[in-house]
A protein has these predicted regions:
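Surface segments flanking catalytic/ligand-binding clefts of nucleic-acid enzymes
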Residues: 2-205
Length: 205
């Protein structure tokens, strides 16, 4: 089993260098949102983008952890005892939905899965089926097109939000004029695009 590189620390160092060289305020603010236990720069970037608040250019999807161990009940062994397997998704997001139910979304990124062979496809199906046995749990597999095209990336974030049972964010406030809401939503879009451009798009793995 591969061990996590200290890419949380590496991401902090990269962001710190940006700060010293006059890098963007978004990169500086991101320092406090970097998560440890990442296997790759892409995982670190996705965690930042999905987890940071809207005002900082993130999607504010919920509490983000990197490569957590998740126990899943498998078939019983020959003695009739319950058997468990452990899976480690790249990213786990946990959030309370509008109905008060806490849901979890697991995300796995595979830079090569866009050109996946039969073995990779079967592996992804097995992984989804394993997670499907868990209550209030959804699994997403992301490939390069979903993360390197911002429109697809934004749609993925919307699907994750819905899987978590959360309301649309941003949503129109009570008494807010439609024009004001559209302006606020557009401003958030530009912030999300800018952060994605800095922490997700440059990564290939």
């Amino acid at each position: 089993m591969k061990k996590p590189a200290d890419l949380g620390g590496r991401a902090k160092n990269d962001l710190a260098r940006l700060q010293k060289s006059g890098g963007s305020a978004r990169a500086r603010r991101a320092l406090s949102y970097v998560r440890d236990n990442s296997f790759s720069p892409m995982e670190s970037g996705l965690a930042l983008s999905f987890g940071m608040p809207l005002r900082h250019g993130g999607f504010n999807l919920g509490n983000v952890t990197m490569n957590p161990s998740i126990k899943i009940r498998a078939n019983k062994n020959t003695q009739g005892d319950s058997r468990f397997i452990t899976r480690r998704p790249d990213i786990l997001i946990e959030a309370k939905g509008r109905d008060g139910i806490v849901r979890r979304v697991a995300i796995d990124y595979d830079s090569s899965s866009f050109h996946a062979g039969q073995v990779d496809i079967v592996r992804d199906i097995e992984r989804r089926n394993e997670f499907a046995a868990l209550p209030n749990f959804t699994h997403f597999s992301l490939a390069s097109p979903q993360v390197h095209d911002f429109n697809q990336y934004q749609q993925t974030a919307i699907r994750i939000r819905r899987a978590l049972g959360k309301r649309d964010d941003p949503s129109r406030k009570a008494g807010e004029a439609q024009a004001d809401f559209e302006a606020r939503r557009t401003a958030i879009w530009y912030k999300q695009f800018a952060l994605w451009s800095e922490v997700v798009r440059p990564s290939e793995f």
